[in-house]
Amino acid sequence: MKRSRTQYAEEPEENDDFNPVYPFDPYDTAHVPFVTPPFTSSNAFQEKPPGVLSLNYKDPIVTENGSLTLKLGNGIKLNSQGQLTTTNTKVLEPLPHTSQGLTLSWSAPLSVKASALTLNTMAPFTTTNESLSLVTAPPITVEASQLGLASCSTSKLRGGGNLGFHLPAPFVVPSSNALTLSASDPLTVNSNSLGLNITSPITLINGSLALATSPPLDTTGSTLNLSVAAPLSVSQNALTVSTGNGLQVSGSQLVTRIGDGLRFDNGVIKAHVAGGNETLRGKIILDVNYPFDATTNLSLRRGSGLIYNESTNWNLTTDISTEKGLTFSGNQIAINAGPCGLTFNNRKLQVKLGAGHTFSSNDNIALNSIATPYDPLTLWTTPDPPPNCTLRQELDAKLTLCLTKNESIVNGIVSLIGVKGDLLHIQPTTTTVGLHLVFDRQGRLVTTTPTALVPQASWGYKQGQSVSSSAVANALGFMPNVSAYPRPNAGEAKSQMLSQTYLQGDTTKPITMKVVFNGNATVDGYSLTFMWTGVSNYLNQQFSTPSCSFSYIAQE
């Protein structure tokens, strides 16, 4: 006898004409290519895959080497008889482990009732809404989950939780626990009566306190008054003194009012003189010394060279002869040195020497036996010029610059030394020190802004240790090549030369020097720009750089 055929999910439910003897479907034999195995039950059996009878199981049952077995977790194992057992589990009190299994240890007031742990209670404790509570009656109360004691306005809880009476002073309870009245002078308690001690000027009149008075005090009605006469008065319920000119009340004293020029000396008012004044026989006079004169009026004794200038409201001025080489520069007398033959060097007036001249051993001008020719291949400021640059203030730096032409290359040496202001003492705002030298289309130095060299600075062809008196007419051969360094081009890397140097020649004070060729955008000629950065790291020190070299391609 054959079992009925298991219906597959892909077959319609109405396919109930299966023939177990002839199992092949006449309409589609591909669905059942063989005869299925004997009967299956939905309880733990299944036909999977089709035509194969297998068990239907779930975790913890698994198969291992073709046999059924169980997955075992922690604390579970099989003994040698194939029995499922548990291992001893570590427990802590109150859960002891016995041969009967885990139990619970307890003690009173805990107990087990109806297999449940419960709490035994006695009045005034009770269990309400599955919570332990306390049954109370007045004056005991429960407020905000705390047990309290109701009290009235005259009672209070003292320290230690004792109930007592709230007694304001002067009521007290001494050690006898009797309510008494505390009294202090002038009150007394005699023979269970409250009394009052009095002394003059207080007295008793008809059982009432009264005040005995004598002039200038008197009583009007129930008020004590003070009789006053000028200059005394009563102001704002206080006795005061009325004052006139020269007097005032200061603090609690009547004092004299004094103005400027007066002072107290041992309680006596005296004139306070200072700044060229003194007192003589009760009079204030001027105490002067030369060059002042105070015989009649205060005047100034003048010597030669000083005059009163009527055009300046009779101010005292210096009388100089501007026709003899003197002039005013600001508020200072200066030498008016003309452009020819004279110059200033290290703040000294000096004669300019041209070609063929020199100073003799006794500092006289003499002719050179052999005139020193000038060098047309070198332009410079002389090797040690005086202050010749204005960067932050007038003549605050000394620039030493030498340009030497070598075929198509110009080699340069530069050094800058600060002599005053922010360059003598570097400030936090002095982050970069820089200067421009601007040249016209012929390579001649432009002595106006933005050129840093002042107009009177030495600049020209090298001749001996000075500059040639011959003017620089064409110096294109010393100029930066505009094809190599187009203008303006301050941001072009090719137009810059960078080198590291050291402030004051100290290798522990590194700074960076940058030379820019034709970088000034305000000119159509040529320019050299020198910048030193990183100087703000050395505050209050003198800005001074070593001699640094640089090179560039010449225009010609």
UniProtKB/Swiss-Prot annotation:
It is found in: Virion; Host nucleus. GO terms for biological process: adhesion receptor-mediated virion attachment to host cell; cell adhesion; symbiont entry into host cell. Induction: Expressed in the late phase of the viral replicative cycle. Its main location: virion. InterPro entries: Adeno_fibre (IPR000931), Adeno_fibre_knob (IPR000978), Adenobir_fibre_prot_rpt/shaft (IPR000939), Adenovirus_pIV-like_att (IPR008982), Attachment_protein_shaft_sf (IPR009013). Keywords: Capsid protein, Host nucleus, Host-virus interaction, Late protein, Viral attachment to host adhesion receptor, Viral attachment to host cell, Virion, Virus entry into host cell. Disulfide bonds: none annotated. GO terms for cellular component: host cell nucleus; viral capsid. The keyword Chaperone does not apply. It holds the Pfam family Adeno_knob. All late proteins expressed from the major late promoter are produced by alternative splicing and alternative polyadenylation of the same gene giving rise to non-overlapping ORFs. A leader sequence is present in the N-terminus of all these mRNAs and is recognized by the viral shutoff protein to provide expression although conventional translation via ribosome scanning from the cap has been shut off in the host cell. Belongs to the adenoviridae fiber family. Forms spikes that protrude from each vertex of the icosahedral capsid. Interacts with host receptor CXCAR to provide virion initial attachment to target cell. Fiber proteins are shed during virus entry, when virus is still at the cell surface. This is Fiber protein.
